[in-house]
């Protein structure tokens, strides 16, 4: 067995049927999203808050999907979801994520000029937006590390390859 620290425990295939263990980081992320939208501190969130909390975690649920999810987990029939119910819901949703699609979503955030590649300029912009104080040299090293074809930019396949090496996906 390998260490779970930093390694994703999400299944690599789409919608693997077995129960998935979340990393501590994922649990924390889910807890923060829940707390953020439990504005009255009741320990529960309603359908509208559930939708916003899921959006904060990178999901885009439809109204009908929200209704069905609440019906599935709302054992006490209150019409709202407590943290344990939300956690079990999000554990299932995270297991259904397609890692390749998640990586490509991230790629598109970097590639804001839609060239199909991540340039030095793209990387620098994202670094600034995230408040990372990286030097130009460090940013260039990141590009050099991922750039397999030597064109000075990172294409989708190069990005997917480097992201898979990180064990985040």
Swiss-Prot record:
A GO MF term: calcium ion binding
Annotated residues for binding of Ca(2+) 1: 38, 40, 42, 44, 49
Subcellular location, principal: cytoplasm
Keyword DNA damage attached: no
Region (Essential for homooligomerization): 1-21
Pfam family, one: EF-hand_7
InterPro entries in the record: CALM/Myosin/TropC-like (IPR050230), EF-hand-dom_pair (IPR011992), EF_Hand_1_Ca_BS (IPR018247), EF_hand_dom (IPR002048), RNA-helicase_DEAD-box_CS (IPR000629)
UniProt keywords, alphabetically: Calcium, Cytoplasm, Cytoskeleton, Metal-binding, Repeat
Stored Gene3D superfamilies: EF-hand
Subcellular location(s) of the protein: Cytoplasm, Cytoskeleton, Microtubule organizing center, Centrosome
Keyword Cytoplasm: yes
Binding-site list for Ca(2+) 2: 74, 76, 78, 80, 85
Region of interest (Disordered), residue spans: 1-25
Any single GO CC term annotated in Swiss-Prot or TrEMBL for this entry: myosin II complex
Domain EF-hand: 25-60, 61-96, 98-133, 134-169
Family membership noted in the UniProt record: Belongs to the centrin family.
Subunit structure: Monomer. Homooligomerizes in a Ca(2+)-dependent manner. Interaction via the C-terminus with other proteins disrupts and/or prevents homooligomerization. Interacts with SFI1.
Function: Acts as a calcium sensor. Part of the centrosome outer core complex.
Domain notes: EF-hand 1 and EF-hand 2 domains bind Ca(2+); the binding induces a conformational change which facilitates the interaction with other proteins. EF-hand 3 and EF-hand 4 domains do not bind Ca(2+).
PANTHER family reported in the protein's UniProt record: EF-HAND SUPERFAMILY PROTEIN (PTHR23048:SF59), MYOSIN LIGHT CHAIN 1, 3 (PTHR23048)
Protein name in UniProt: Centrin-1
Organism, as annotated: Toxoplasma gondii (strain ATCC 50611 / Me49)
